[in-house]
Design a protein with these regions (language model features):
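Preference for long, solvent-exposed alpha-helical segments and helix-linker "stalks"
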Residues: 1-178
């Protein structure tokens, strides 16, 4: 088990003084702050750790690129840790994942695609977006996964496809009355 409490003492100065030194600085930093967040009991502290994780994703993009891919990780993390804190976090996660998918297109990770549809449906259920938007989101997601299945079929992609199909079917967003 990693000793993050000790590790942060040497990590922080490197992060502050040499932010472009290594992508691993960000990978390790995110792991470390996720551990802190998941073991914290105070809500304000958990939220501060989540904010730090978001900042680390942004800095990783700034120094090492891979914007679409890293935005996918950022959107997943935001929704994992803040989804239950209010619809504004779902909206923010949805927008981050949408941008990730627009950049990555057929290289989008299946988890990003599935979570994007889940967020879209959540926003529809909360009357934040119309069913037409959910349908457009589903079409985009479905096309990405179909293209991935054509290029290199895998059970992971097939499960993602089945998951978005089930979620969209269960959501009632496809009704003619909506």
């Amino acid at each position: 088990h990693k000793n993050f409490k000790d590790a942060i003492l040497s990590w922080r100065p490197v992060f502050n003084e040499c932010p472009a030194s290594s992508k691993n600085l960000y990978l390790f930093g995110i792991d470390m702050y996720k551990n802190f967040l998941e073991t914290a009991s105070d809500v304000a502290i958990k939220n501060a750790y989540c904010d730090t994780i978001m900042m680390l994703h942004d800095r990783r993009i700034k120094y090492f690129g891979e914007e679409g891919k890293v935005l996918g990780y950022k959107g997943i993390d935001l929704l994992r840790y803040r989804r239950s804190d209010g619809v504004e976090f779902i909206k923010q996660g949805y927008e981050i994942l949408k941008k990730s998918m627009e950049i990555e297109n057929v290289k989008s990770q299946p988890a990003v695609v599935v979570l994007y549809i889940t967020a879209s449906i959540s926003l529809f259920m909360d009357k934040q977006i119309q069913n037409e938007q959910v349908i457009n989101d589903y079409i985009m997601a479905s096309e990405i996964l179909d293209e991935q299945l054509k290029k290199s079929p895998s059970s992971k992609i097939q499960q993602a496809k089945e998951s978005i199909n089930k979620n969209i079917s269960d959501s009632k967003a496809l009704t003619c009355e909506a």
